[in-house]
């Protein structure tokens, strides 16, 4: 029985065979050239060919050098343009907004006892770690501002809370995280609905945190240029009261009564004191504009 592969073998096409034969003839013809004739031909054509090759190479080299010089000049011009156009300053408020937009959680406001804001912030951060709710409670902030206080003729720069009695908390609100925040010492509750508080909007939180961001950006820019920090408009407070002072209440339900100051809170601009009512001393909280020093 014959092999089908052998029977099905295809005869090579005539064109392909002739092409291969032509290529073989060329190779054989090259091999059959007389060495003396080849050498003579090389000598006859060698010098002009080498000269032409040198000229071509020289022309190519000149063109390459010219192109390289043009590229360098273009780079120099581009560099000059970049130096001539300083980078546009970054708007710190816009940068803050972009950063806040990408952060996890929502911002809530909690109410604290006056003067306990920083203590509440520290306690809350510690409790978030110890009670394993770091994945829900991310950040606590007490916005501050710099003011000038004048007391007994002495001028002093101090930082005080911008929102006395309040702390900002960035968190995911769950039953567990709500309980940790609400039961932090010094916290009296969430602002708004006590059990289902509403978060601040992006515009609201930006407005609260923007002044500090602007101050920081201005300070860093001045330091980078080796200049002093720019002067800022600050509030001036004149403190005429001291613990132990006897004052007269000028406004409110205790007007005309005498009080003795036992605590002063410059941040909230309030004092705590004792007012004698029906022969008994009663603790009260009064604002600076409700009392007058005797």
UniProtKB/Swiss-Prot annotation:
Residues 40-53 have a biased composition (Low complexity). Participates in transcription elongation, termination and antitermination. SUPFAM superfamilies: N-utilization substance G protein NusG, N-terminal domain, Translation proteins SH3-like domain. Residues 1-91 are annotated as: Disordered. CDD domains: KOW_NusG (cd06091), NGN_Bact_1 (cd09891). Belongs to the NusG family. PROSITE patterns: NUSG. Keywords: Transcription, Transcription antitermination, Transcription regulation, Transcription termination. GO terms for cellular component: cytosol. SMART domains: KOW, NGN. This is Transcription termination/antitermination protein NusG. Gene3D superfamilies: 2.30.30.30, NusG, N-terminal domain. Residues 25-39, 59-85 have a biased composition (Acidic residues). It comes from Streptomyces griseus. GO terms for biological process: DNA-templated transcription termination; regulation of DNA-templated transcription elongation; transcription antitermination; transcription elongation-coupled chromatin remodeling. NCBIfam families: nusG.
